[in-house]
Amino acid sequence: MTETEQTTAPIYPLKRNWTWWYLNDERNKSWEDRLKKVYTFNTVSEFWALYDAIRPPSGLNALCDYNVFRDDIQPMWEVPENSNGGRWLIVIDKGKTPEMVDAIWLEILMALVGEQFGKDMESICGLVCNVRGKGSKISVWTKDCNDDETNMRIGVVLKEKLMAASKDHSKPLFDVIRYEDHESCQKKTSSVVKAKLSLHSSDAPVAEKSAV
């Protein structure tokens, strides 16, 4: 490609800015000191250049996190955009292959930056991957944990994307996705938080259910 062709190549801007954050595994430091801003992107080419340049979730050490959040929202429960929110959570047990973990992350990431949640994009804050030795977690954070209607629509799209991506694997990428509010997660006294909403990979499609 000539220099002229490079400068005139389409940029394909995204609708909004997204910032990629990385939390390292240096447990002797505070959480804030472990969190690093990697890059803010707002075009398709920037997104793929960044994605191709860094390790996938399966390549991270245990206790590391990836966070991709929109419009300068910080990946913290305490900030105003997240304080009343919740998350659609996918728990990935150790039985899942590294390729399946990476497939879940990429599928949801592409859906977010590609604005595939329609009008409900305004209710989505970002995407988180927590890499842990006992099993990792991937979650989509939303602004209002009490807006069940919007959160369910987001969950349905999330399920549809993951079910479609599951066709490239020997079994579904997930068993269940659960919606939890952040406040309950912070105050939990056990490893399990009661879900406000849930969707199973074995459930009939929502369109079929609503017709009954």
From Swiss-Prot:
List, alphabetically, the GO terms of the cellular component aspect: cytoplasm; eukaryotic translation initiation factor 4F complex; P granule
Q: What is its main location?
A: cytoplasm
Q: What GO molecular function annotations does the UniProt record carry, in alphabetical order?
A: RNA 7-methylguanosine cap binding; RNA trimethylguanosine cap binding; translation initiation factor activity
Q: Which cysteines are joined by disulfide bonds?
A: C125-C129
Report the subcellular localization: Cytoplasm
Keywords for this protein:
Cytoplasm, Developmental protein, Differentiation, Disulfide bond, Initiation factor, Protein biosynthesis, RNA-binding, Spermatogenesis, Translation regulation
Keyword Disulfide bond attached? yes
Name the GO terms of the biological process aspect.
Answer: embryo development ending in birth or egg hatching; oocyte maturation; regulation of translation; spermatid development; translational initiation
Q: Which superkingdom is the protein from?
A: Eukaryota
Matching InterPro entries, A to Z? Answer: TIF_eIF4e-like, TIF_eIF_4E, TIF_eIF_4E_CS
Biological role: Recognizes and binds the 7-methylguanosine-containing mRNA cap during an early step in the initiation of protein synthesis and facilitates ribosome binding by inducing the unwinding of the mRNAs secondary structures. All 5 eIF4E proteins bind monomethyl cap structures. Only ife-1, ife-2 and ife-5 bind trimethyl cap structures which result from trans-splicing. Translation of trimethyl cap structure mRNAs may be regulated by intracellular redox state; disulfide bonds change the width and depth of the cap-binding cavity determining selectivity to mRNA caps.
Record protein name field = Eukaryotic translation initiation factor 4E-1
Q: Source species, please?
A: Caenorhabditis elegans
